[in-house]
Amino acid sequence: MAHPHLLAERISRLSSALEKGLYERSHAIRLCLLAALSGESVFLLGPPGIAKSLIARRLKFAFQRARAFEYLMTRFSTPEEVFGPLSIQALKDEGRYERLTTGYLPEAEIVFLDEIWKAGPAILNTLLTAINERHFRNGAFEEKIPMRLLVAASNELPEADSSLEALYDRMLIRLWLDKVQDKANFRSMLVSQQDESDNPVPASLQVSDEEYQQWQKDIGAISLPDPVFELIFTLRQQLDNLPNAPYVSDRRWKKAIRLLQASAFFSGRDAVAPIDLILLKDCLWYDAQSLNLMQQQLEILMTGHAWQQQAMLTRLGGIVQRRLQLQQQQSDKTAFTVIKEGGMFSRRPHYTLPPEVSASTLTLLLQKPLKLHDMEVIHITFDRSALELWLTKGGEIRGKLNGIGFAQTLNMEVDNAQHLVVRDISLQGTRLALPGTAEDSMPAEIKQQLETLENDWRQQHTRFSEQQHCLFIHSDWLGRIEASLQDVGEQIRQAKQC
């Protein structure tokens, strides 16, 4: 078997070749290729004339030997037009009911059925068996169907509670396509002279029958780690608890997990990673409402839980809370304390400075810097006599901010613990302390916890960086996940600097 990274590179080049000349269809091609390489079915929803059939035709060129069958369903379509006409010779000579399947669905590797919901019950029932069991009953015999990819298309969804729901449930990947939107792409499409029937894939990239069969075994060997399973189960529980969530059968979950295994395998990994779960957004929706719902739920999962983002923020919140507790304890110990005076009949308490304060000026540190009079202040210098007068009689108090300039009016008070508290214009306050008593350093306990948390963040970011190279995931998702991780990292760094 090829080295995993070489295989991933080959599949990437194969997809690029298939995408040539198709504008704004890269994601659809890649998911159809993934479906073809893992033997799954795709439903394309969109208006006529947006290259749905061309996507299916292109996928034939992914293989060295692949026969294609395509058919436009109508209300009058018959099984003979899809599965082959009856053999008149066999019926006449031997009385056998047998179809001539050459050139029809039972002998095709790539199948495209347009306007699928117009098919009648006879076609639908046979098609269900073909998809489920990859077998076709031809008269008295069961014939194996080589179908690797079924692409069904329509410009509408099946009606709810109709006989079509069973077939719709078999369409694992569901893609909602629209017209070309970008101006430059629209122009390129208009002037393109590419022949749609040309094979754009070099022979060296095409998949042989032997490779395809071996890969089916290899896909099944891809592991599902416990943390990834927990994410899947969390998503399932979230959907079960939402009133408007689509019903997802156990069969559909199981088939979706195999698709995730295929995504991991063709990305060069030996285990399903959280990044692969984004594919579920194209597997679990039923209609427009549930499509938006799946997008929202997966975004919550990917940006909040897949790489422990929310768990790390919760831990950070606990660390910050503990730090505040320690700071409060330290603040109580180091805050400058005045002496309460006055008899029991005094109208208001008054205070005096401690006897050890004897200098004509007194500089006190803010335990937490504040912005006062448009200045970031870390200490205030008071005239001792002015401070004593304020402590005794109240009124206005002034001090030099950071010890410079003219003395400025301060919003200051004595709290219940007899500490001096200064407040800014928003009434945020901090206690004052004598120089040499304020504790500036972060407690060792908090430092260690923040270091451990930052190391855990680095590990999660490294995991994401190693896993993000997935051909089948749109780059927009990678950007949102990276932003969520960077936000967590920034909050941790800010906490370390405080």
From Swiss-Prot:
E.C. numbers: 3.6.1.-
Protein's cellular compartments: Cytoplasm
Catalyzed chemical reaction(s): ATP + H2O = ADP + phosphate + H(+)
Broad class of where this protein is predominantly found: cytoplasm
Entry annotated with the keyword Transmembrane helix: no
Residues that coordinate or bind ADP: Y23, G49, I50, A51, K52, S53, L54, E196
GO molecular function, one term: ATP binding
GO cellular component, one term: cytoplasm
Keyword tags: ATP-binding, Chaperone, Cytoplasm, Hydrolase, Nucleotide-binding
Keyword Nucleotide-binding: yes
Enzyme class: hydrolase
Known regulation of activity: ATPase activity is stimulated by ViaA.
CDD domains noted in UniProt: AAA
Lineage top rank: taxon: Bacteria
Assigned protein family: Belongs to the RavA family.
NCBIfam families, per the entry: PRK13531.1 (NF010054)
Function of the protein: Component of the RavA-ViaA chaperone complex, which may act on the membrane to optimize the function of some of the respiratory chains. RavA functions as an ATPase.
Assembly with partners or alone: Homohexamer. Interacts with ViaA.
PANTHER family per record: ATPASE RAVA
Protein name (database record): Regulatory ATPase RavA
UniProt organism field: Salmonella newport (strain SL254)
